[in-house]
């Protein structure tokens, strides 16, 4: 429907598992070894490193020393145009092409680069009315990454943790190189001299509007 022109291609939830059984997946969720992306299938690991043990993302650990973290992120696969050969009949292939506009999940062997990794640090309140402006550091640290098919791996420490004597929560964002999105010109505005949208020509949808070569079908 027309409203779909305003939506993104959808986010993804990922979970680290020891096996792909139902129980294995639920165990990963219970252990909070999870992360989300805005859609690309990015691989991400975020570990707390100690002298005796490694704790994965989602862990809660009591420490007296400054924590040391390790992050690794690998970009999603670049997509090849069209659809792979699913071995379907001619009729099924025609129907598939009509449904998805001839574009499927069709990964190549080349991955997108991770351009940087951002670290966010949150310090929980000590009392209900404590101002939160200084407690949420977004972003706290930024690490630029070199282009690599092996992804990006960094290690860092919070040198203020022990001195501050307060609990802290850390999470990371892996930023992938830009990629094309679907239906980015859905309203197709006509602009005045000041750059204001004065008229729209919404993308073709079902039987309500006429299609044009610029239309993108999902």
Question: Which positions does each model-derived feature cover?
Answer:
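Exposed aromatic-hydrophobic patches
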Residues: 151-161
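Single conserved hydrophobic/aromatic residue that forms the stacking wall/gate
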Residues: 208-218
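Catalytic cores of secreted or luminal carbohydrate-active enzymes
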Residues: 2-57, 63-89
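Short coil-to-beta strand junction motifs in C2/discoidin
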Residues: 85-117
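Divalent metal-coordination and catalytic microenvironments
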Residues: 29-32, 119, 172
């Amino acid at each position: 429907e027309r409203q779909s022109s305003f939506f993104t291609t959808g986010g993804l939830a990922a979970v680290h598992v020891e096996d792909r059984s139902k129980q294995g997946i639920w165990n990963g969720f219970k252990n909070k070894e999870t992360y989300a992306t805005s859609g690309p299938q990015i691989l991400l690991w975020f570990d707390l490193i100690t002298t005796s043990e490694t704790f994965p993302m989602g862990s809660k650990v009591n420490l007296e020393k400054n924590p040391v973290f390790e992050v690794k992120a690998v970009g999603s696969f670049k997509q090849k145009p069209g659809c792979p050969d699913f071995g379907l009949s001619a009729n099924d292939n025609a129907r598939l092409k009509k449904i998805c506009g001839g574009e499927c999940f069709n990964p190549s062997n080349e991955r997108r680069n991770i351009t940087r990794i951002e670290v966010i640090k949150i310090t929980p309140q000590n009392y209900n009315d404590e101002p939160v402006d200084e407690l949420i550091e977004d972003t706290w640290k930024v690490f630029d990454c070199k282009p690599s098919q092996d992804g990006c791996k960094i290690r860092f420490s919070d040198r203020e943790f022990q001195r501050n004597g307060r609990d802290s929560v850390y999470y990371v964002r892996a930023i992938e190189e830009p990629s094309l999105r679907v239906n980015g010109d859905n309203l197709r505005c006509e602009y005045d001299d000041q750059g204001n949208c004065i008229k729209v020509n919404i993308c073709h949808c079902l039987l309500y509007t006429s299609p044009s070569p610029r239309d993108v079908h999902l």
